[in-house]
Amino acid sequence: AQQRAPDDTTQALVETLNVWHPGLFITSGHATERDWQIGYGYRNGSFRCADGQLFGLDTRDQRLAIDSPNPKVYLPIGNCLMGNIDRRDCMALAWMNSAGVHQMLGYTVPTWYGYMGWGVLDYFVEQPGRYTFSEAFLANHHALVHRLATYCPEFLDQPSGDTGRPRLRPALSDQAKAAGLT
């Protein structure tokens, strides 16, 4: 039978970490170095950090402590900036400090597509047991470099600007156009 989830899922997610002790935690949606907005497109709580501690903050501003020391892999596959360690008090370090994260990946720039995050999910989760987390990251990295070399060869020769984005828009190869990329 179908069940209805609470409008604010912050407490349920905090309890998942604290009580159920998952070995893998996957998130997506809007994030910064200081928070993860659970709902993104709808009203919900958030995960935040302070003094190296990760905590949930629900829509009533109730702070929910996260203490989940069991080792886990964290995949913020669709979260901008979750991997950017710009100072001591940031989400990546709080996940490691109070949520037991031993391995994670994370974007250091804003992203909307996230080939590396979603690709690692495919190799690591969608093909269970075939790759370790590190192997999934490496395999996906090779796939990304191959895709760039095949579809946008000029891209690999361009230096990045301060934003991490290429200075010039690279031309698409004939293979890219045949694949429907525009």
Regions found by a protein language model. Name each.
Residues 1-27, 32-34:
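Functional beta-strand-loop-alpha-helix junction segments that form "active/interaction loops"
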Residues 24-120:
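Catalytic cores of nucleophile-dependent amide-cleaving enzymes
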Residues 6-7, 61, 127-130:
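Short, exposed beta-strand "edge-strand" segments with a Pro/Gly-rich flavor and a Y/T-containing core
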Residues 2-5, 39-62, 157-180:
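Surface-exposed intrinsically disordered loops and tails
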Residues 77-182:
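Active-site-proximal C-terminal subdomain of hydrolase catalytic domains
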